[in-house]
Each structure stands twice: as structure tokens, then as C-alpha cells.
């Protein structure tokens, strides 16, 4: 996503003036993220560890956009046994959590969890709900629609997708069965 790339580069550029060590770390994360996107995303399945590292790098880069009003909680567990997953499966949900869940003028939160339960993988994302005006809803739902199609193709009959708009928050959970 060019918009993400340009925003991240601008954020890192500003960070260089304040904290060079952190800026250098974020450049490394951006490099890893781009490398993963270029070289791993064309594989049918990837090791879960690589996907977790990708999500972690992405989330850390998105934190650069957050101010003190935003709380970001991340709990990504590497499974005890080797598991494989479709690459970049959850990125649209993480993007949406930051896009719709973080507001620079209001208290906001994003909670992302990923864990193994036996042979299953469970991804959970919850974020504060800051509704946008109806005029700013172009393209709404395309990422989620594409995610559903990818799930149908890659995990037919082997996934569960739950989403809910709760009081002041949006919640989504995806369970992938038999990911060994």
C-alpha cells in the first residue's frame, strides 16, 4: 500500500530528529515488512512464525501514528508446534483497526491477539469505534469481502468468522481449524 509506505517514511523521518535509535529500529522493521510482502506473500502457505513477525512489524510501524490517547495491546503467541497459514490473511483487519479505531482527538484502543489452541489458530482484533461520516465511506467493506473470499478458498469448511459492533467497539475473531 503506497499510502502506508509514504506515511511510515514520513513518520520515521520525523522520529530521526527525536530518537535516532528507535528510528533505525523502525527502518529495519519496514525493510523486513517489505521483504516479507515481496518474497513470501506469493506462497500458498507460510510458517506462522513469519506471519507473526510480519504482523508485529506492521503494528509497531502503525504505533508511530498514535498519540497518547491511543492504547495498543498486542498478544501474539508463536505456536508450540510448526503450523502454516495463508500469508497476509489478517492484515486488512489490522489496517482497519488502526484506520477506524484510532482517533487523534479521542481516547482510543486497539487490541490484537493471535494464539494456537490445539491444531487451531485464533486471531482476535477489537478496536474502539469512531464512526466516520457517511460521505467518507467510499470503498467501505472491500477488504473484508476479499478476506472472506480468501478464507472460503483457503479454508473451506475449516474456519469460523465472527464479528460484532459492540457499544463503542468493533470486534472480530477468526478461528482456522487444522493448521498443521
Task: Outline where the language-model segments fall.
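Two-component histidine phosphotransfer core
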Residues: 3-175
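C-terminal end segment of the histidine kinase catalytic
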Residues: 179-180
